């Protein structure tokens, strides 16, 4: 018999997104971070092999607003250099994602119409994939350029609930170890999946939330801790009888911020199979 409790811990089952472009309107910081690495994406794109078509993917794209200007500029650069190859862009996220706003954005029906590259440029095709990025999403050897920003800190499932906080940064040692192990497995799966998808000479550029050498992370860079504030308010709801103990615990974020060592671990000798000779390296 299936474990009903375990099912509720699966990220694809429990996460949802508010619509109408809510995400992009409230994540200017993510857009600023994405815009800052435009040059890296340009170099990656201009180094791609001369395939018949170019297939790009934006993994964990949300409503597409934070990366829209980046993709617009990349396509504009290609076209300005006389590269008129067909371009497919696959946006991936959970099935509950705000794909409606995403498709409207790219056609100029919503948001920044001057960046609606699907309408502005010829021979550009936009698709969506409503499956999480912890598994292979595209046919092997078909992806020219993969990109992901501020998304892959999400784990595929919560290995446990956190009893006295809302986020792993405030969890006890046992809970942290379980999340760390889950995140390690997920990170290897992510890299192996992208390696299978990439065509020869393909590139994958990924920008993630993490914990730096000083222990800083999103919402904890000096002053108040964002997640401690979240927990304080959520705990107050429990103390006041507004929510139950179960509801408090179930609010555990399905996230883990990796350290540099955790990001680099799959590339160590002990996990060298990440880069199989028959597959392109990530």
Report the location of each language-model feature.
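N-terminal charged/capping segments associated with class I S-adenosyl-L-methionine
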Residues: 1-139, 154-171, 206-214
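A conserved beta-strand element that flanks and buttresses the S-adenosyl-L-methionine
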Residues: 147
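Short catalytic micro-motifs in class I SAM-dependent methyltransferases
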Residues: 150-151
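A short glycine-rich, Lys/Arg-flanked "PGG" loop and its adjoining helix->strand segment in the class I
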Residues: 166-174, 182-200
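Short glycine-centered segments of the SAM/dcSAM-binding site in methyltransferase folds
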Residues: 203
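Conserved Class I S-adenosyl-L-methionine
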Residues: 218-245
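Short alpha-helix
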Residues: 256-270
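Single conserved hydrophobic/aromatic residue that forms the stacking wall/gate
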Residues: 272-282
């Amino acid at each position: 018999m299936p474990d009903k409790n375990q099912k509720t811990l699966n990220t694809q089952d429990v996460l949802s997104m508010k619509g109408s472009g809510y995400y992009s309107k409230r994540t200017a910081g993510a857009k600023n971070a994405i815009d800052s690495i435009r040059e890296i994406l340009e170099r990656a794109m201009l180094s791609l092999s001369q395939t018949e078509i170019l297939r790009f993917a934006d993994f964990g794209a949300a409503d597409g607003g934070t990366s829209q200007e980046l993709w617009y500029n990349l396509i504009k650069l290609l076209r300005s250099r006389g590269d008129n190859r067909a371009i497919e862009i696959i946006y991936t996220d959970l099935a509950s994602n705000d794909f409606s706003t995403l498709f409207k954005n790219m056609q100029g029906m919503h948001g920044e119409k001057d960046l609606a590259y699907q309408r502005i440029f010829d021979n550009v095709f936009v698709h969506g994939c409503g499956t999480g990025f912890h598994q292979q999403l595209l046919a092997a050897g078909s992806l020219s350029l993969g990109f992901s920003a501020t998304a892959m800190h999400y784990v595929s499932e919560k290995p446990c609930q956190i009893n006295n906080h809302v986020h792993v940064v405030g969890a006890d040692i046992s809970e942290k170890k379980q999340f760390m192990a889950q995140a390690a497995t997920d990170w290897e799966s992510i890299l192996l999946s992208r390696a299978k998808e990439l065509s020869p000479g393909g590139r994958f550029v990924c920008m993630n939330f993490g914990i730096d050498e000083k222990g800083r992370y999103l919402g904890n860079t000096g002053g108040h801790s964002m997640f401690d504030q979240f927990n304080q308010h959520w705990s107050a709801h429990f103390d006041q009888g507004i929510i139950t103990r179960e509801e408090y615990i179930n609010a555990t974020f399905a996230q883990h911020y990796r350290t540099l060592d955790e990001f680099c671990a799959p590339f160590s000798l002990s996990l060298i199979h990440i880069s199989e000779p028959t597959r392109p390296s990530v």
